[in-house]
């Protein structure tokens, strides 16, 4: 490659807030030149059905680069492709690396150059990297890729089909979805072959990409074996085949237009530290508004802001443990502090009918004991300190937390509403529990037999596929399993409970004899990409219902 060597990159992956322990991050970083990525076995049970990684590339000075959204995991050769694009200066040697014909006028080179420039910029744009879900060799070569997240790529109109080739001739490629006829000119220095795809949605939602490869030599054809060896290059380090990738490019930014013979330019505004990507409805209480922003920052941004006020379902609320809490009673507040379960406070009907949310006020003459208020202040500071030390904390969280603490009394002599400190403490306890749940246990502590105590919930279970001789990749994967007790009240917070099991659990709690006790079983599954060998051919298939993602009692 020409040009200076790229500074060490760090890729930080998060899946719905999944966080690596600092020790694990340090160990991985020392072995991968600063690249950190999660293998399939490391996905926590709380991951979405198709794991979605948010990859942030950081350069020197910890400067944020473009973020990538990856469906599945980012393989080492896929990361190497992105690094090669960013390092390229597009001289003859770089053109040979990507198999670009020197006399070719196709759109592949401009698309590669745009991708390289985009990878070197800062910003909030996102790039989708989709993995192969299925390949069919006869009667036509057909490639179908995994679906992106809902709404994630509907407005994107161009993609790069990246091949990691083995030995092969120069070919002319035609097919559905491609931008006209395209040429591939591999040499001994070629590591990647790239095709430009217009309107790539058909690669996952339609019939797939149908390709026809015609060697440049007159009368030559490629057999299926030659085609497989050419398009699915061998990874000598892992003794596997490297499958194609679909890199969906972000929309091009509008270019400045010239006026009166001169080029008028206007710089894009620098991204500022916004407390929330979407504006929140105005609140009469700055404390409640800031607390809402903190919760949203830690739980992840909403896909689309909505001002719709949702009504609570009385039937759903009836299934939760209920009780009256006198907020003027120090003993009741003390019991509330000892309980770290999520808390739902309902206002009176009169307050609920107000047009504006009512400010939070504590009772003016509440008999708050000095010891109780000191305990709230101490536990609040401890919870805030623990929250600040969480790895992977969003940068918007610390200033929001500092503002909330400033609005709360920190001892019995401080001014401020003591109920604010209590509400903030309960919120931090819930966020801390959810964040730790996303972290999960370390790899060394994982086993199929752990975690049987407690309510029905998703547990980690690794399945060995080496006994299935036809499966080449993966050798092991995280299948998960459901374990735990089914009891009333349900405490695994699964929204898929039916009335039937609710009645059974209530009967069981009353001591009624049941012929069959409710069982903890999977209620939702996700698929898995398997690469198998059949009749001396390698094929990739997306097999459904391979990974348990939710549990419930039935």
UniProtKB/Swiss-Prot annotation:
It comes from the Eukaryota. Preproprotein is proteolytically processed to generate N- and C-terminal cleavage products that homodimerize and associate to form a biologically active non-covalent complex. Binding of the non-covalent complex to AMHRII induces dissociation of the pro-region from the mature C-terminal dimer. The N-terminal portion of the protein, despite having no intrinsic activity, has the role of amplifying the activity of the C-terminus. Expressed in Sertoli cells of fetal testes, and in testes just after birth, but absent in adult testes. In female, AMH is expressed after birth in the granulosa cells of the follicle. InterPro entries: AMH_N, Cystine-knot_cytokine, Muellerian-inhibiting_factor, TGF-b_C, TGFb_CS. Keywords: Differentiation, Disulfide bond, Glycoprotein, Gonadal differentiation, Growth factor, Secreted, Signal. Glycans are attached at residues 62, 326, 410. Residues 1-24 form the signal peptide. GO terms for cellular component: cytoplasm; extracellular region; extracellular space. Disruption phenotype: Homozygous null mutant males have a complete male reproductive tract and functional sperm, but also uterus and oviducts. Most are infertile due to female organs blocking sperm transfer. Females are fertile with enlarged ovaries and atypical follicles. Furthemore in the absence of AMH, follicle growth is more sensitive to stimulation by FSH. The record marks 446-447 as: Cleavage. Disulfide bonds join 456-520, 482-551, 486-553. One of its GO terms (molecular function) is growth factor activity. It is found in: Secreted. Residues 25-446 form a propeptide. GO terms for biological process: anti-Mullerian hormone receptor signaling pathway; gonadal mesoderm development; Leydig cell differentiation; Mullerian duct regression; negative regulation of ovarian follicle development; ovarian follicle development; sex determination; urogenital system development. SUPFAM superfamilies: Cystine-knot cytokines. Plays an important role in several reproductive functions, including Muellerian duct regression during male fetal sexua,l differentiation and in the adult plays a role in Leydig cell differentiation and function. In female acts as a negative regulator of the primordial to primary follicle transition and decreases FSH sensitivity of growing follicles. Binds to its sole type II receptor, AMHR2 that recruits type I receptors ACVR1 and BMPR1A which subsequently activates the Smad pathway. Belongs to the TGF-beta family. Homodimer; disulfide-linked. This is Muellerian-inhibiting factor. It comes from Mus musculus (Mouse). The gene is Amh.
